[in-house]
């Protein structure tokens, strides 16, 4: 019986990341060995464009495959509506989906939109999305820093 090995899907979203700031895209001034290693074992987009130059709409587009106005996230500090599905909600159940980092599409503290593994890093955005009783919860990153 052949075992089908599914590929890992890893998306890395960075802020203020221009094409000319990564070594694998030809920059010879900035060393990015970890990103170069990922590029060597994967693929590099050579003709990619963002749908919007600000964080939340761009993230919504990449996670949902929809234009910002269709995903109903036309600006920052707009929560991704529950009826808009992300890639984590569209892949089969045998994938474990995790999100680590800055979400900017809703509450930063609690798992949502199909992601079951969740490490939030932005406490300041709770004010935009959390109910007041949830403001007592702090991000995993906050707890990590306190433990240091």
Where do the protein language model's features map onto the residues?
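Formylglycine-dependent sulfatase
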Residues: 1-148
């Amino acid at each position: 019986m052949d075992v089908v090995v599914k590929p890992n899907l890893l998306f890395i979203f960075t802020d203020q990341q221009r094409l000319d700031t990564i070594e694998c895209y030809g920059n010879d001034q900035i060393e990015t060995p970890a990103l170069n290693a990922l590029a060597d074992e994967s693929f590099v987009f050579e003709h990619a464009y963002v749908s919007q130059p600000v964080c939340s709409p761009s993230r919504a587009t990449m996670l949902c495959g929809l234009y910002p106005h269709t995903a109903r996230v036309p600006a920052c500090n707009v929560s991704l509506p529950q009826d808009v599905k992300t890639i984590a909600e569209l892949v089969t159940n045998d994938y474990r989906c995790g999100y680590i980092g800055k979400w900017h599409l809703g509450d930063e503290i609690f798992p949502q939109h199909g992601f079951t593994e969740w490490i939030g890093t932005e406490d300041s955005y709770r004010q935009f999305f959390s109910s007041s009783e949830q403001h007592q919860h702090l991000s995993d990153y906050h707890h990590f820093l306190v433990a240091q």
